[in-house]
A protein has these predicted regions:
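Catalytic histidine neighborhood in serine/cysteine hydrolases
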Residues: 309-325
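Conserved alpha/beta-hydrolase "acid-adjacent" motif
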Residues: 294-300
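Catalytic histidine-centered segment of alpha/beta-hydrolase-like enzymes
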Residues: 322-334
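Short, surface-exposed "cap/lid" segments of acyl-processing enzymes
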Residues: 42-89
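Alpha/beta-hydrolase
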Residues: 177, 181-286
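Conserved acidic catalytic loop of the alpha/beta-hydrolase fold
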Residues: 118-139
Length: 348
């Protein structure tokens, strides 16, 4: 049995994991999507593994959320590959290594908010079509994190025949406060005092390293914060992020992220609406949230759970000692394991 150590490398030698990189044409001809694929090398012919596709959140791309090795161990993609999955992660348009519009790097306030939720769902559809063309499997598993749960949920509610299981980590749902306070929670740049429309936000926003760290561990005692995400681990992760989404290079003290999701937070989520209907999801669904998540608190997962009336099976779990970003923290392997076991289960 292959064992994965939360705080270090594999207890036994890491099996060789093959990695592939693809540039997937988007449904929008101006968009090209970066897709990463990991699997056990030489284990089974292509297409024999179960398929899982990871969908990232509002600020950080899949490249560094799902495939950055932490604490001397492997990444989430590595973990899934070692356990027999064809594991994929992609960057939504404007994020990471996917194509960016001209507004990127030319001033964050230029243009309309880029990469709104319907755009991200279109990117996921292009990825699913590409992956299904490479495998005989008719259905894929989806794992979404944060905003990625709205993307994956929106896809599953529209294309349920293509989805086997879906896992929602730190799921986003309708916000129980005003647009300004919602933006204060989510945005890491200056918040306008009055927001009548998300279109006022501009195409991109900047996020500083110091603000990203503060938001990650806010509400935690300093010693607990250092245990969950040691400063040295955060610094290494930030360098990887800045290398693909920074204003300059890996030494950059700030990164840029599209504002489409922020516009949706103002126009939709904080206005008492949602971008998808959980009632339309038919696949078995697992919701996972950390007990210290202040970005998407447990009430959001509870409300989604109550609306999953069409799901053939549903489960909600609160994981101890985890924040909104528990996928990158010291206890992350508990999250990995629960996700894997759910995806490997056949529900009747």
């Amino acid at each position: 049995m292959r064992n994965f150590d939360a705080n270090g490398p594999f207890r036994t030698a890491l099996p060789k994991v093959a990695v592939d990189y693809f540039r997937v044409p988007g449904i929008d001809p101006a968009v090209t999507i970066h897709l990463r694929h990991k699997r056990l090398a030489g284990d089974l012919p292509r297409g024999e593994h179960p398929v899982v596709i990871f969908v990232h959140g509002a600020t950080y791309p899949g490249t560094v959320v799902f495939d950055h090795a932490m604490f001397g161990g492997g990444s989430w993609l590595d973990y899934m590959a070692v356990h027999g999955f064809d594991a994929y992660s992609f960057d939504v348009r404007g994020y990471g290594l996917s194509s960016r519009p001209a507004e990127f790097g030319e001033g964050s306030r230029r243009g309309l908010p880029y990469a709104r939720t319907p755009d991200a769902i279109a990117d996921l559809k292009a990825v699913v079509d590409f992956v299904r063309a490479r495998t005989p499997r008719s259905k894929v598993n989806l794992v979404g994190w944060s905003w990625g749960t709205a993307i994956a949920g929106g896809f599953a509610s529209k294309y349920g025949e293509l989805v086997r299981h879906i896992v929602m980590v730190s799921p986003l749902w309708i916000i129980r406060n005003s647009p300004v306070s919602a933006m204060s929670r989510w945005m890491t740049s200056a918040v306008p005092t009055l927001l009548q429309s998300g279109d006022l936000l501009g195409a991109y926003r900047s996020i500083s390293k110091s603000e990203a760290r503060r938001r990650w561990v806010r509400g935690l005692e300093p010693d607990v914060a250092e245990q969950l995400m040691p400063r040295a681990e955060f610094d290494g992760w930030w360098r990887a992020l800045a290398n693909v989404q920074g204003n300059d290079d890996e030494s950059s003290e700030s990164v840029e992220a599209p504002n489409g999701v922020m516009a949706d937070l103002v126009d939709v989520w904080s206005a008492g609406q949602a971008t998808y209907t959980p009632e339309s999801i038919s696949s078995p669904t697992l919701l996972l949230v950390g007990e210290w998540d202040v970005d998407t608190p447990a009430y959001m997962a509870q409300e989604i759970f109550s609306r999953l009336k069409g799901a053939s099976y549903k489960r909600l779990e609160v994981l101890a000692r985890g924040t909104h970003s528990m996928a990158l923290e010291v206890n992350r392997v508990d999250l990995y394991r629960r996700t894997r076991e759910f995806l490997q289960t056949r529900f009747i």
